[in-house]
Structure formats: C-alpha cells, structure tokens
Amino acid sequence: MNSIKFPVLDRTTKNSVISTTLNDLSNWSRLSSLWPLLYGTSCCFIEFASLIGSRFDFDRYGLVPRSSPRQADLILTAGTVTMKMAPSLVRLYEQMPEPKYVIAMGACTITGGMFSTDSYSTVRGVDKLIPVDVYLPGCPPKPEAVIDAITKLRKKIAREIYKDQIRPQQGNRCFTTTHKFFVVRSTHTGNYDQELLYPPSSTSEISTETFFKYKSPVSSHELVN
C-alpha cells in the first residue's frame, strides 16, 4: 500500500496572518450581534413568543431584544400602523444609531392589509414612513420565515460597503388623512406640523380682512350691480 504523505505545513509569517479590510471586519462584527427593537401593534407580533421559546431560540443568532431605540440597530415592525401611531414609529427610527435596519413583518405592515381597503386611518405600507431593508409577507409569517428574513439581512450586512451605509439625508415625511405625504422638518422634538395633519378648509384660508377691505360702507345695491 502506498503511504499517504501529508504536505509539510508552512509556518512562515506570510501564511499565519489573516488579511482583511476594515469594512469586512466591521460587517463581520455586526453579523452576530443584532439588537432588535420589537415594534408590534397587531396579531403578527404573537409569533415572537414562539421565537423566544426553546424550539426556535432566536438567541442563537445573537439577537438581543432591546426596549430602547438608542440601544438597537434593528427594528421589526409587525402589525397595522395607523396614522396616530406613525409619528411614534418615525421618532423611534430616528433615535436609533447608524447603521440601522428595518424588517417589515406581515401583510398589514407591508401594504396595510385588509384594514387599508376602506379605512382612512391606516398607513398603506410602513415604507412610506421609514426605509425597509427586508419584506416578510404573511398573515402571520411563521417563525421559520422570521429566521429566514434575519438570515437574509445578515447576508446583506456582509456585502455592505461603508460608503453605502452613509445614507443621504432625506426629509422626514408627514401624512394627511388622504394619504398624501409631505416633506417636513425633523421630528426629534416630537412635535408634528398640525397644519399638514389637518389641512385647513378652503373657507378658513380666506382671511377676515378680505371681507372688510372696503374703507367706506357699500350698499348691497352697489355690490349687486
């Protein structure tokens, strides 16, 4: 029988050093340390109870749920987002440090679901408020689908370039009851422009001075003629 010859290991310094880039090192360090902020408003959020359990145990992926947006780099939105809750969601997203990511979980979060058909108070898609990285459809999505979405997000983080992480400063979007979005100032103060939320009617826009612009009294006969 022929003897198996093992190659001699090269123990030189050249093969003992791992070379990488700062960008890849930063991406690798964040792959297994995602700290999610769980934002649930409806029935899809109950699936997180299964994820926390021993069967799926999403702690093995390095996920550490946080209750403060300033300590989270991932927000999972699950359930219907209403007009009244939209300012709170935008403010939570703004308080998260960069780089930050968003997973939209469930049909109600992605498109508004069945509630957006005849409802004036439902936001038709959370991507109208904040940028979404991974869409997770379902009503509700299974825990396996949530894990798959997290895996896809980790692959996206691994391919990121540092320059792409610096997102352009886009204006914050405000909404009206007719689902029209306007660019407004920063919402860090928590005070939204009420004029955009509740636009004045056409009659209220006319100032009272227009009704009394005549210095001298005018008779009704002169106005008709």
Swiss-Prot record:
BP term (GO), one: aerobic respiration
UniProt entry tagged with the keyword Cytoplasm: no
Reaction(s) catalysed by this chain's protein: a plastoquinone + NADH + (n+1) H(+)(in) = a plastoquinol + NAD(+) + n H(+)(out); a plastoquinone + NADPH + (n+1) H(+)(in) = a plastoquinol + NADP(+) + n H(+)(out)
Cofactor(s) recorded in Swiss-Prot or TrEMBL: [4Fe-4S] cluster
Keywords: 4Fe-4S, Chloroplast, Iron, Iron-sulfur, Membrane, Metal-binding, NAD, NADP, Plastid, Plastoquinone, Quinone, Thylakoid, Translocase, Transport
Main location: plastid
InterPro entries hit by this protein: NADH_UbQ_OxRdtase-like_20kDa, NADH_UQ_OxRdtase_20Kd_su
Topology in membrane: Peripheral membrane protein
GO function terms (MF aspect): 4 iron, 4 sulfur cluster binding; iron ion binding; NADH dehydrogenase (ubiquinone) activity; quinone binding
Domain of life: Eukaryota
Pfam families in the cross-refs: Oxidored_q6 (PF01058)
EC number(s) given by UniProt: 7.1.1.-
Cell compartments where the protein resides: Plastid, Chloroplast thylakoid membrane
EC supergroup of this enzyme: translocase
Binding site for [4Fe-4S] cluster: C43, C44, C108, C139
Subunit structure: NDH is composed of at least 16 different subunits, 5 of which are encoded in the nucleus.
Function statement: NDH shuttles electrons from NAD(P)H:plastoquinone, via FMN and iron-sulfur (Fe-S) centers, to quinones in the photosynthetic chain and possibly in a chloroplast respiratory chain. The immediate electron acceptor for the enzyme in this species is believed to be plastoquinone. Couples the redox reaction to proton translocation, and thus conserves the redox energy in a proton gradient.
The family this protein is said to belong to: Belongs to the complex I 20 kDa subunit family.
Name under which the protein is recorded: NAD(P)H-quinone oxidoreductase subunit K, chloroplastic
Lineage, top ranks: Eukaryota, Viridiplantae, Streptophyta, Embryophyta, Tracheophyta
Designated gene of the protein: ndhK
